[in-house]
Every structure is written in C-alpha cells, then in structure tokens.
Amino acid sequence: MRDAFAFGPVCHQPPDRKGTRFPGGTPVYDEDCLYLNVWAPAGAESLPVMVWIHGGTFLTGAGSQPLFDGAALALSGNVVVVSVNYRLGPFGFLHLAPLGDDYSSNVGLLDQIAALEWTRGNIAGFGGDPQRITVFGESAGSMSIAALLAMPAARGLLTGAIMQSGPSQAFRPEQGEAVALGLLAELGIDRANAGKLLELPAEAIMEAAGRLVQRLTGGSPAMIFQPVVDSLTLPEEPVRAVANGSAAGIPLLIGTNAHEGHYFFREGAQVPAIEESLKVLQQALGTPDLSELASHYPANWEGPAGILTDLFFWGGAIAFAESQLEHGPVWMYRFDWGVKEHPLLLRAVHTAEIPYVFGNMSHLRDLGLAISPPMESLSSSMQNAWIAFAHGGRPGTRDLPWPEYGLTERATLIFDETACVVKDPDPEKRRLVFKYIS
C-alpha cells in the first residue's frame, strides 16, 4: 500500500516566482517526479477515462496544478480523470539519441506513454474502463497528443483525443541535435563525454538550459525543448504521420482560442519593434519571410499577436484536422469568450478555456472575477461536450448538436455567451494563412 493523500513531487522546471502555477505554495521539485493523479466518483464502475496532459511550453507545469483538479469534471461527467507528470525541458526533450546507443530522445513523450500504459493496466481498480481512454491536453499537452498519435509505441493506448490550443510541433533531427550540443557547450562538456551529464546536479542543468533558451530565443515564444523526429520514437513529423494513417479510427476533437497570441504579446509589455517581432515569429514558427502576411495585420503589438493566433494555432489546428479527415471523425471548435472585468481575459487568450473545461470556476474567483450565469452556462456546455466525447466518441449533445468537421462546410462550434455552429469561419483569413503552412 502507498500513502497517496498528497501530490507527488513536480518535475524540475524554472521556478514559479509569480505563484501562478502553484498558488497554494511551493511544490517539491525532484527528478523522482513521474507520478499521476486519479479522481473517480464514489462507486465508479467501468466509467470512461479522461487523461490530462498539461501544457507549459515543454518547460513548466505538472498534473497537480490546482487549475487541473479533476474532481468537478469527474463528478459532473461520471468519468474517471487522470492527470500525469512528464519530464520537462532538458530532462524530457533533449535529443541525445545521435550520441550513441546509450542515449535516448523524446523521453518526456515516453513518460506519457508509460502513464497511459499504467492507466490501461490499473484504472479498472479505480472504476475506469481501460477500453475507453481519451487523452486531452492544452498547449504543449496538445502538441504532445499530436506526437502520441504519430508514435508506434502509443498505438492501442488511447481511444479518443482532444487537442486544445496546440498543433503539431516537432524539430527536425538536426535542429534537436543542435540544441543538445548547445546545452553540452553551456556545461563545458564535449560530445564524446556527454555521459558526464549524469554527474551534474539537476540545478546546474536547469541553469545552463535557461542560459541557452535566452541565447537562442531572446525571450521569444520559440520552444527549443520540444519533440524531435527520431527513428526509434517519433519516426515521422506528427501531421504527416497522421495523414498517412497513424491515428486511423481515433476520433479527434480539436480547436483553439480566438486570441491565443495576445497571451504572448500584450499591450504595455516590452514588445520589440514590428520588424523584430516578425523575426521572432519566423524563428518560433519556422516559417519563411512574414512581411507580406504582416501587411494584413495592425502595425503594432497586435500584429504579431494576430499572426501567432492565426498562423500557428488556428492554421495549425486546421492542418492537423485535415490530416485526420480520411482516417477518423473530426470536430472543430473555437473559444471566443472574454471577460470585460479582467485586463488579460478580456480576450479569449491562450489557456483561457481551461477553467471552463474542468469546471474549476474557483480559479476565476481567485483572479477577482464574479462568476456570472453566462460563465456557468459556458462551463457546462464545454464540460458536457468533452464528457460526451469521452463517453461515446462524439461531442454533440441533445442541447448542443455538433456536426463533424469536413472540407466542404468546415463546421466549427463557437463557444461564447451562446454556443453555435458556424460554417467555415473567416474563410479569407484561412486561405491567407494557409499560404504559409507547408
């Protein structure tokens, strides 16, 4: 028997100086961090399972963050909710496989697969059905799901996927190797002696990774630690693997928020000049010259915010949805809700949908917001759709019919004060950004 009345340690990551990830206090950070959490209704038996994979740019986060508490979702949906930890940053996403047979890559993704294997083998003891496991995640968690759908080792471990605000993202092998060698250089270790990493304290590796991130990105949204195409673990870029049938038969619910980029580029913050911001986006997105695209956006901080929203998040979600259309049913959503009383949540920014999906409205109260009836209704609508998907592989409900996404009508469920289906929202902008999506 194991005492499981407290959350396990959190994987090493940059400190939470603002207290936004863990507002209740500083968690324990440890390399022994591969724990998961289970919430189940009393008397649960053969209930569908929802496994949450947290985001955080592959650098931060944990399944134990209060925002991801699964109690409300489990009770309202009669489901079993699981949240998982996985190794982050240089500990989870350093592409070391090219250095020899003793080294691995994508171990953060392999941690997620281990959690899914544990869930399949043990969740019946908590009242869950191992034959109905839906993975859902946001940002880097959603990008992780894109990778899982492409990984041979994950096949058979999940029966449905919900991707929130995170498209397919993976380095080419040479990009991942350059980052790995850059970290070794920061630590004064040459390629032939990479095994010395095992002799270093985690804090030293974290500090070197922080210096490398700053040097390579200049503080931009670019992610230097992320999944890498690797012959043993992730043999093909996820969107291409899915287009080739790697996720055949798996229902997919995918979507974005209307103003994702306004989370990263904010009014009043120190934002580079528009030319520098475009360079930052080109680096972060791996796209060619964006100057022509930028001419369609405001020539201030809102321009880069809009491009990041439309090209990376929205365009990426559409591209991934299209890759799965021939192989399984797909549903598309967009979260538009904003709260006038909050300067950041005034718009539907990145992460804004999470408390509504989990039903954790206390998170919004902690931000000083009064919970209005429309907010409660929005949360119920989103929870009911996610729960219906977990139970039966379709998000539509009697109160909220939701047609499948297809190339002809591109039906998209818009979550706002009232939820409604819109056919092909903003088609001109969709065609514009797709010129930049390979």
Regions found by a protein language model. Give the residues of each.
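Alpha/beta-hydrolase active-site loop
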Residues: C33, D102-A124, Q175, G182
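Alpha/beta-hydrolase-fold serine-hydrolase catalytic core, especially in secreted/extracellular enzymes
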Residues: L232-L234, I250, N300, G315, ...
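Short glycine-enriched nucleophile-adjacent loop
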Residues: S142-A154
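Catalytic nucleophile serine of serine hydrolases
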Residues: G137-A140, P152, S165
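Alpha/beta-hydrolase fold nucleophile elbow
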Residues: F126-E138
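Active-site loop->helix "elbow" adjoining a glycine-rich segment at hydrolase catalytic centers
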Residues: G55, V107-D111, S139-S142
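Substrate-access "cap/lid" subdomains that shape
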Residues: G121, R155, G160, Q164-V280, ...
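Non-catalytic accessory segments of hydrolases
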Residues: M1-N106, P221, L364-M382, A390-L400, ...
